[in-house]
């Protein structure tokens, strides 16, 4: 895998670039080419549902559906409890799980009610680690985290790359 970082001020088009990569908005000029088995494909010629199954978007404010922590993580793909725990350890979400009343079986409300924004970001990143996709887009993954947590995000990004994912990190500053 590879790591790419888009750094820029607010309003400079970083998130819009990610939306173009996801096929949500068309580019204002040019085209987006994807490599598939050595061949270049124009994103406009790719069936979007197929493309979306190959990417993961971790936003600043991730959408968390109601259900347990375990259910949310397993919705990314089947894995063992040990794999869940390993992914959570990398992102630091294991400490959050340890503090939850029912641990992995704690029920989350719509939007992740019961978790802070930073905890929701860690949960979404843990989900990305559980089942790495071909393209992982991280929008300000450390926006709501402290410096220690930023190191965990870096470790998660490196693990995604090692799993073969192309990771695009969107950031306002180069610190990450």
Protein language model features and the residues they cover:
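The feature captures the beta-strand-to-loop junction immediately N-terminal to the Walker
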Residues: 7-9
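Conserved Q-loop
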Residues: 61-67, 77-78
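Helix-to-loop junction immediately C-terminal to a conserved catalytic motif
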Residues: 22
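ATP-binding Walker
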Residues: 12
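ABC-family ATPase nucleotide-binding domain "signature/switch" substructure
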Residues: 16, 56, 72, 106-176
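ABC ATPase nucleotide-binding domain helical subdomain, centered on the C-loop/LSGGQ "ABC signature"
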Residues: 31-37, 70-110, 154-155, 159
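ABC ATPase NBD Q-loop/coupling interface
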Residues: 26, 31-53
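ABC nucleotide-binding domain signature
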Residues: 5, 49, 53-60, 168
């Amino acid at each position: 895998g590879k790591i790419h970082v888009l750094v820029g001020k607010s309003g400079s088009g970083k998130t819009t670039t990610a939306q173009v990569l996801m096929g949500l908005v068309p580019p204002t000029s040019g085209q987006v080419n994807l490599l598939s088995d050595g061949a270049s494909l124009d994103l406009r010629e790719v069936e979007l549902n197929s493309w979306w199954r190959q990417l993961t978007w971790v936003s600043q404010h991730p959408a968390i559906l109601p259900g347990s922590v375990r259910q949310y993580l397993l919705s990314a793909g089947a894995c063992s409890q040990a794999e869940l725990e390993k992914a959570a350890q990398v992102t630091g979400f294991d400490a959050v799980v340890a503090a939850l009343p029912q641990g992995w079986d704690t029920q989350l409300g719509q939007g992740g009610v019961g978790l802070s924004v930073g905890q929701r970001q860690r949960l979404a990143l843990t989900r990305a680690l559980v089942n790495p996709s071909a393209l992982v887009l991280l929008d300000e993954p450390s926006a709501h985290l402290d410096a220690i947590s930023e190191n965990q995000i870096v470790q998660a990004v490196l693990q995604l790359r090692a799993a073969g994912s192309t990771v695009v990190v969107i950031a306002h500053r180069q610190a990450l």
